């Protein structure tokens, strides 16, 4: 038992997937929304965090740090069907008592988002995603718990609104993720609220919560985590945007804490 445990992962492209481009309505792209046919979005993200793992097995908390360079792309196959995928290079380091470092590919994923129903303000969609691990040495402390294929089904609900004269959107997502190679399956609940203060400036407030299923495996016990993030997105023009965000865990049970920053560059095409 490493004292590190299966670390949570998620796509930081989700942070950038709500592209409020110049002249577009709030929440036009990503999240619960599908892309118009023949259009796409590319997001390059660099993020990093430091934190502590839980004190398992009588060991003290474990210092941890991680840096990822992530590429995410989504493309509208039809107005109601969007394909998306991502890959990332990862540096993940554990401190004593089991120091170990992993440098290589993080999880890569490929998925489809289908619009189920929409009105003028509301949109409902579903997603199916498969995750392929980059690490394959389950005995290495920095890879343990993150060497198995995973699959996920997700339901998304989005709504555009105005707060006074400020356009905004809210996106709520619920997912169930099947894990292999050790860790228990997981429920994911993500919430995003965005406000477009000017044609170029958007504020996003987000929460990413994961609650695993119960398990009797002492190596991979049940765990919970909730990460809050605030970020600003600035549209350079109708195709390019930049994003700066900060995030921190606000709740953890038998998994690591996180405190970090994220930088992203968006390109609509």
Please describe what each predicted stretch is.
Residues 1-35:
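Cleavable N-terminal export/targeting peptides
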Residues 27-179, 188-269:
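Transmembrane beta-barrel domains of Gram-negative outer membranes and organellar outer membranes
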């Amino acid at each position: 038992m490493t004292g590190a445990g299966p670390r949570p992962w998620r796509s930081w492209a989700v942070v950038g997937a709500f592209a409020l481009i110049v002249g577009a309505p709030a929440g036009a792209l990503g999240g619960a929304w599908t892309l118009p046919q023949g259009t796409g979005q590319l997001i390059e993200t660099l993020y990093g965090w430091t934190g502590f793992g839980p004190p398992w097995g009588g060991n003290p908390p474990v210092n941890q740090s991680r840096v990822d360079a992530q590429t995410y792309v989504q493309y509208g196959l039809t107005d109601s069907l969007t394909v998306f995928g991502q890959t990332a290079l990862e540096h993940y380091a554990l401190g004593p008592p089991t120091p170990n470092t992993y440098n290589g590919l993080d999880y890569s994923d490929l998925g489809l988002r289908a619009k189920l129903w929409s009105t003028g303000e509301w949109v409902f969609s579903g997603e199916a995603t498969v995750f392929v691990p980059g690490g394959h040495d389950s005995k290495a402390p920095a890879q343990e718990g993150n060497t198995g294929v995973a699959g996920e089904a997700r339901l998304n609900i989005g709504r555009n609104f105005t707060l006074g004269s400020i356009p905004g959107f809210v996106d709520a997502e619920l997912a169930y993720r099947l894990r292999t190679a050790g860790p228990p399956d997981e429920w994911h609940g993500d919430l995003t609220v965005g406000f477009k203060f000017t044609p170029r400036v958007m504020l996003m407030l987000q929460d990413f919560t994961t609650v695993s299923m119960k398990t009797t495996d002492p190596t991979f016990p049940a765990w919970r985590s909730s990460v809050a993030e605030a970020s600003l997105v600035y549209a350079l023009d109708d195709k390019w945007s930049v994003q700066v965000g900060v995030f921190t865990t606000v709740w953890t049970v038998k998994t690591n804490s996180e405190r970090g920053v994220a930088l992203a560059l968006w390109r609509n095409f």
